[in-house]
């Protein structure tokens, strides 16, 4: 158990002794007794002792009231300090909540960026890498050059065949003309002897 404070001891004693009710009545009785004792001129020791006893009780009651007042002041100061501490704790809690909200928003952005990055990485992984793509492009370029060279060769051969075919057609035409001319000459030569024999 913790140590008992002075305030707690005083509070318990005050609860045992009472809350000071009837002090005004006790003071009034003391004043009346004192006035009566003064006016009577009596020197009775018992009456004097009773007044001293009442005075002591009044002094004790006043001291008790002062103690209660001081204790209340200390409690008020303590409550004020607790209130300030609570206000500071609430303000710190609000700042912490605001900071946590910022951290949550940042975490959400990071998570979103990571998800977008993962999705983009999956798309990239579905395509060949740069080195492989360059190799394929080089192979296609090489094949295209070979096809272009083959096309040029075929076109050259086709042009050569076209020229040769043209020469062949010209030769055939000339040969045909020559044959026709030979046929005409042969016919003319056959007709000439017959004309000579008829006269």
From Swiss-Prot:
Residues 73-192 form a coiled coil. GO terms for cellular component: cytoplasm; nuclear speck; nucleus; THO complex part of transcription export complex. InterPro entries: THOC7/Mft1. Its main location: cytoplasm. It comes from the Eukaryota. GO terms for biological process: mRNA processing; mRNA transport; RNA splicing. Keywords: Coiled coil, Cytoplasm, mRNA processing, mRNA splicing, mRNA transport, Nucleus, RNA-binding, Transport. It is found in: Cytoplasm; Nucleus; Nucleus speckle. GO terms for molecular function: RNA binding. It holds the Pfam family THOC7. Component of the THO subcomplex of the TREX complex which is thought to couple mRNA transcription, processing and nuclear export, and which specifically associates with spliced mRNA and not with unspliced pre-mRNA. Required for efficient export of polyadenylated RNA. Plays a key structural role in the oligomerization of the THO-DDX39B complex. Component of the THO subcomplex, which is composed of thoc1, thoc2, thoc3, thoc5, thoc6 and thoc7. Component of the transcription/export (TREX) complex at least composed of alyref/thoc4, ddx39b, sarnp/cip29, chtop and the THO subcomplex. Belongs to the THOC7 family. This is THO complex subunit 7 homolog. It comes from Xenopus tropicalis (Western clawed frog). The gene is thoc7.
């Amino acid at each position: 158990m913790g140590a008992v404070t002075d305030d707690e001891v005083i509070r318990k004693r005050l609860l045992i002794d009472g809350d000071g009710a009837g002090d005004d009545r006790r003071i009034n009785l003391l004043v009346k007794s004192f006035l009566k004792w003064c006016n009577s001129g009596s020197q009775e020791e018992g009456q004097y002792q009773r007044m001293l006893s009442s005075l002591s009780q009044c002094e004790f009651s006043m001291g008790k009231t002062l103690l209660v007042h001081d204790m209340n002041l200390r409690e008020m100061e303590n409550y004020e300090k607790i209130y300030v501490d609570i206000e500071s704790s609430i303000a710190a809690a609000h700042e912490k909540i605001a900071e946590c909200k910022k951290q949550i928003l940042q975490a959400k952005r990071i998570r979103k960026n990571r998800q977008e990055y993962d999705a983009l990485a999956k798309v990239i992984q579905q395509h060949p890498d740069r080195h492989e793509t360059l190799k394929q492009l080089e192979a296609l370029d090489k094949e295209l050059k070979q096809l272009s060279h083959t096309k040029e060769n075929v076109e050259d051969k086709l042009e050569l065949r076209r020229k040769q075919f043209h020469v062949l057609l010209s030769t055939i035409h000339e040969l045909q003309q020559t044959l026709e001319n030979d046929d005409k000459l042969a016919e003319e030569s056959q007709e000439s002897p017959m004309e000579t024999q008829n006269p």
